[in-house]
């Protein structure tokens, strides 16, 4: 299985307590090589202000969000391994993990898995798409040794 090239950018005011680069690498490697070989992904971990600004600019939503995915569209005739960028908001991940009673590490893993599937073209706008994407997320999270991230919704 090929490995994903990771460009990790830590852009928080305080970067202490974040997952290690090796963890981000493990989470990416659990998703992307199943679908695409020789991939490069940038993960940028940001604070609330940057997440809010990007979410407003690119999605028209005037609030921060947990993860944003920016797939790279390769121009016709070019071959590139760049899959895209994930922007993950530290404070949103921490807040959601606490509110949902999930281990913080598991929620970080879920955000990387979720965002990576978006980079690969998966979405959750329509119900059938959401079911397919959530099933994949659950399968990958279980393979990584974490609980089903949607268990609370299924109970």
From Swiss-Prot:
It comes from Escherichia coli O157:H7. It comes from the Bacteria. SUPFAM superfamilies: Metalloproteases ('zincins'), catalytic domain. It is found in: Cytoplasm. Its cofactor is Zn(2+). PANTHER family: ENDORIBONUCLEASE YBEY, CHLOROPLASTIC. Zn(2+) binds at residues 114, 118, 124. Pfam families: YbeY. One of its GO terms (cellular component) is cytoplasm. Binds 1 zinc ion. Keywords: Cytoplasm, Endonuclease, Hydrolase, Metal-binding, Nuclease, Ribosome biogenesis, rRNA processing, Zinc. Single strand-specific metallo-endoribonuclease involved in late-stage 70S ribosome quality control and in maturation of the 3' terminus of the 16S rRNA. GO terms for biological process: rRNA processing. The gene is ybeY. The keyword Chaperone does not apply. Its main location: cytoplasm. GO terms for molecular function: metalloendopeptidase activity; RNA endonuclease activity; zinc ion binding. Belongs to the endoribonuclease YbeY family. This is Endoribonuclease YbeY. InterPro entries: MetalPrtase_cat_dom_sf_prd (IPR023091), YbeY (IPR002036), YbeY_CS (IPR020549). It is an enzyme of class 3 (hydrolase). Its EC number is 3.1.-.-. The keyword Cell inner membrane does not apply.
């Amino acid at each position: 299985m090929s490995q994903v090239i990771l460009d990790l950018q830590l852009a928080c005011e305080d970067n202490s307590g974040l997952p290690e680069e090796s963890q981000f690498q493990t989470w990416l490697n659990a998703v992307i090589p199943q679908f695409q070989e020789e991939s490069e992904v940038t993960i940028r971990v940001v604070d609330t202000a940057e997440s809010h600004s990007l979410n407003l600019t690119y999605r028209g939503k005037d609030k921060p969000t947990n993860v944003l995915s920016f797939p790279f569209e390769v121009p016709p005739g070019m071959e590139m391994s760049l899959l895209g960028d994930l922007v993950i908001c530290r404070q949103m991940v921490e807040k959601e993990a606490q509110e949902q009673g999930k281990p913080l590490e598991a929620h970080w893993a879920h955000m990387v898995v979720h965002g990576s599937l978006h980079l690969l073209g998966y979405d959750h706008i329509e119900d059938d798409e959401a079911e397919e994407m959530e099933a994949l997320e659950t399968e990958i999270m279980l393979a990584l040794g974490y609980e089903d991230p949607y268990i609370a919704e299924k109970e």
